[in-house]
Every structure is written in C-alpha cells, then in structure tokens.
C-alpha cells in the first residue's frame, strides 16, 4: 500500500453529518489501532454546498475528490431545496455528476438479513429461517437512464414520451467481469437478470454474460427474467448470492432486496470504476425528518467504511473485523430506534461508541 490512502469525506445534508461522525470513529481506529495510513479531508456537498457556495458540487469538492483515493459520502437533499429546478437539486446536481465524472459504472449493494434482526423482515419466518446475504451488482452508467434519444413531445394534440435503452458490448463485459471476480471471493454463484424474451438489449446482455462466464469455469451462472426474479426473491431469497443487473433492473432489484432486510439503515453501498476508485455511501437517504434528533442508525455509514477497506484498500481481514464488530453489537442486543422492537434503544453517537469499542477490543 502506498504511503497515504487519501479519503475525501463528504457528509452532506440531513443525517449525513450525524452518521459521518460515527464513521470518523472507525476511521480513527483504523489509523491509530490498525496503523492504516489513512488521510481524510472533508468537503462540502449537496444542499449545504448550495447554501454556502451556490452550487451542489463546488469545484473545490470535485478537485478534492480527484486528489483522493476514495470518496466516503453521507447523504444529500431535503425539502429545503425541493423548489429548485430539478437539475439544480442536491441529488441531481451532486451525486449524479460525481458518478459520471469518475465513471463509476458498478454499483454494489449488499442486502444481508442478520439473524438477530429477523423480526424486522416483512417476509414469513419460514422463508427467512436461514437468512440471506445477497450482493446486487448494478451497471450504473449505461442503459435506459442514459440512452438517447429521450424526450416528451406533442403532435396533433397527442402527447407522447420516449426513452431509449442502449447497451454497448464493453459496458456489459466490464460489469460481468467484475461480478465474476467478486463471485470468486464469495460463494461462486451468479444469477444474471434480464428480459431477453422481449428486449434486444437484454439479448445482448445475456450473450455477453455467457461469453464472459467461460473465463470463470469455477463460478456457476444462471439467468432469470426480471419479472420472475422479483418473485423468486420474495419466495426464497436465500437461493441467491450475487445478482447481476442492468441499470434499470438493478435499481428495482436492489431496493426490493433492501426492503426485505427490514431496515435500510443497515445497508451500505459502493460505486466503483475500472481503476477500483470508489464512492462509498449508505443506501438510504438524508432522512430530514429525523435530522438533529441523534436517533439515526449509523451502521450503514460504518459498513460503508468497511466496503471502502474491502474494495478500495483490498484489506479483507480488517473489513471483516468491522463487519464482525457490528454483528457482535447486534448479538449483545444493542439497537438504534429503527431496528428496535421497544423503546429501549441507543442514540446515534452511543451506537457509534459501542461499535468502535468492540472493534478495538475484538470482542
């Protein structure tokens, strides 16, 4: 590892700064207890940047990210900025440009049901008795969300709108290679999601995924149509390990997997480019309704640090220690408000302290 691993920290809006404070506790332990050569610099982003600097993504922030090895992101947005033109709102004017600027083509969304939190899942107990640990891998820069032409027109008093799904072979190839490489670090199993019985883009998707799979004979590949996949996830989520999806289908599937865990406050995510530069963030939003109340769940932000260590720094053992600290805390009965089934729960800072102390002690 090089002398310094530089992290651009972007707390953002809503609960972002609150949960980021707890992530800092973990980062400090990684520096001081595990002797990792981390260097953090904090930058403004989102609505707070609009208020202070007139733009959601200031040049200083972008430059700071360019001079870093990874981005640790909080959350952006809130009702305060909802009246702005849509392209100037924090979500559209900060996170999306960051993804585009750094060509973050791969979105990794883990969805894990912890045995201690099964009561949170909306699924029947017999369905989730064995739990599940799914990694959704979503292609993030191609497909329907970016295809041209797109528009809304009116002709002869008839209004219509259109979008275009376009996938280039190299876009599918690179996301498939990443999925197979990650499968080799997990359970050697991938299910690719498409709609190749209807869509030409999905026909190409399936053909290329099959072709790439020949380079990974130790990984079992299966395919499902998107409509069947959404049903199978509800019927038996434990049958899946890695789900490989296009942009649109991954958007749908990853949210479905998230909701059946019972709390999005537990779920981190990573967006990577071909050089493994990544943006790491909680899967949830800025939650302005609980901002400043010190009740937000910091676990997703802490696990985002774990993903940064795992995928950005390639330090699996230390990432596992962070993950295990979270599991240990849950086993001991510690809860935040969103995952508690009673009124006895920890505040945001208290949960951060418990996880940090557990990481140091290893208990």
Curated annotation (Swiss-Prot):
NCBIfam families: leuB. Binds 1 Mg(2+) or Mn(2+) ion per subunit. This is 3-isopropylmalate dehydrogenase. Belongs to the isocitrate and isopropylmalate dehydrogenases family. LeuB type 1 subfamily. The lineage of its organism: Bacteria, Pseudomonadati, Pseudomonadota, Gammaproteobacteria, Enterobacterales. Catalyzes the oxidation of 3-carboxy-2-hydroxy-4-methylpentanoate (3-isopropylmalate) to 3-carboxy-4-methyl-2-oxopentanoate. The product decarboxylates to 4-methyl-2 oxopentanoate. SMART domains: Iso_dh. InterPro entries: IsoCit/isopropylmalate_DH_CS (IPR019818), IsoPropMal-DH-like_dom (IPR024084), Isopropylmalate_DH (IPR004429).
């Amino acid at each position: 590892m090089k002398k310094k691993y530089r992290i651009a920290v972007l707390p953002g809006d809503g609960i972002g700064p609150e949960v980021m404070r707890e992530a800092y506790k973990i980062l400090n332990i990684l520096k001081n207890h595990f002797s990792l050569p981390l260097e953090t610099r904090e930058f403004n982003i989102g609505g707070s940047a609009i208020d202070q600097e007139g733009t959601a993504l200031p040049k200083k922030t972008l430059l700071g990210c360019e001079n870093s090895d990874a981005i640790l992101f909080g959350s952006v947005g809130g009702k305060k900025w909802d009246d702005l033109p849509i392209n100037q709102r924090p979500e559209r004017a900060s996170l999306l440009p960051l993804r585009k600027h750094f060509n973050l083509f791969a979105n990794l969304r883990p969805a894990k049901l912890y045995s201690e939190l099964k009561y949170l899942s909306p699924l029947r107990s017999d369905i989730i008795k064995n739990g599940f640990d799914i990694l959704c891998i979503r292609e993030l820069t191609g497909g329907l969300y970016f295809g041209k032409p797109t528009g809304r027109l009116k002709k002869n008093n008839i209004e219509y709108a259109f979008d275009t799904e376009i996938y280039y072979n190299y876009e599918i190839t690179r996301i498939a290679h990443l999925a197979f490489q990650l499968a080799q670090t997990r359970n050697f199993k991938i299910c690719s999601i498409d709609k190749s019985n209807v869509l030409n883009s999905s026909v190409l998707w399936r053909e290329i995924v099959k072709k790439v799979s020949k380079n990974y004979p130790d990984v079992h590949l299966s395919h499902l149509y998107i409509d069947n996949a959404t049903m199978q996830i509800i019927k038996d989520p434990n049958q899946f390990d890695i789900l490989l999806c296009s942009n649109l289908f991954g958007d749908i599937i990853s949210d479905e997997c998230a909701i059946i865990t019972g709390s999005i406050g537990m779920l981190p995510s990573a967006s990577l480019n071909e050089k493994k530069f990544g943006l790491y963030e909680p899967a949830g939003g800025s939650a302005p309704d609980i901002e400043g109340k010190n009740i937000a769940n910091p676990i997703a932000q802490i696990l985002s640090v774990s993903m940064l260590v795992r995928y950005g720094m390639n330090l699996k053992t230390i990432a596992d220690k962070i993950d295990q600290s979270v599991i240990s805390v849950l086993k001991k009965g510690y809860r935040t408000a969103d995952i508690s089934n009673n009124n006895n729960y920890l505040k945001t800072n208290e949960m951060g302290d418990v996880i940090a102390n557990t990481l140091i002690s290893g208990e």
